[in-house]
């Protein structure tokens, strides 16, 4: 590049400005959803509801008043360790079978799973308390799994945290011997468990 003729890049360098921009408001987790919404001009304190509502919008799920939307990742836990946040980037087709199975076994009038893309899905709960401490799996690869379970931030959120943790643990039992995961493991791939 040193000897290339780059008149347009040269002009950009001559007229351009550099600097830093704070894209994450104080008190917000520095995730991509927060930064992207801030860059797009959203007033985070008044509109941010978490990743779940964005996931719902991206797959066309219309949320009703009183529903709580949560991002639902298919992850890989090996032993007691969160091996990876994406189940080895599971295909959407494989994931759809697993999400349908979870819906059949764990879904109800108050709990519904929706298929998204690859490992990224949606869980909608009627009611519930959003004041929860949820650790994004991509932030903690190779960490012990159990300490990462959902914790209530206030006593009123205990019931919601307990429900979500129960869904997580039951899903592990359901998915461990699912044909999709057995096939993935036979092929040397990580299971979505």
Label for each model-derived stretch:
Residues 86-192:
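Glycine-rich, mobile lid/loop segments that gate access to catalytic sites or pores
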Residues 1-106:
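Active-site nucleophile/metal-coordination loop of metallo-enzymes that catalyze phosphate/sulfate
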């Amino acid at each position: 590049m040193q000897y290339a003729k780059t008149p347009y890049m040269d002009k950009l360098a001559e007229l351009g400005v550099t600097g830093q921009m704070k894209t994450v408001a104080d008190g917000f987790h520095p995730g991509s959803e927060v930064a992207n919404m801030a860059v797009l001009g959203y007033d985070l304190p008044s509109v941010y509801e978490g990743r779940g509502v964005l996931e719902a919008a991206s797959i066309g799920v219309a949320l009703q008043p009183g529903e709580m939307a949560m991002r639902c990742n298919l992850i890989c836990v090996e032993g007691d360790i969160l091996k990876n946040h994406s189940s080895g980037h599971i295909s959407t087709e494989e994931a759809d079978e697993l999400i349908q199975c979870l819906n059949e076994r764990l879904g109800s009038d108050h709990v519904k799973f929706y298929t998204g893309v690859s490992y990224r899905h949606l869980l909608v709960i009627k009611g519930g308390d959003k004041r929860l401490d949820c650790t994004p799996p991509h932030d903690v690869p190779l960490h012990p799994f159990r300490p990462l379970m959902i914790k209530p931030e206030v006593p009123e959120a205990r019931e919601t945290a307990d429900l979500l943790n129960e869904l997580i643990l039951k899903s592990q039992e359901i998915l461990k011997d699912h044909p999709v995961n057995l096939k993935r493991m036979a092929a040397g791939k990580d299971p979505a468990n």
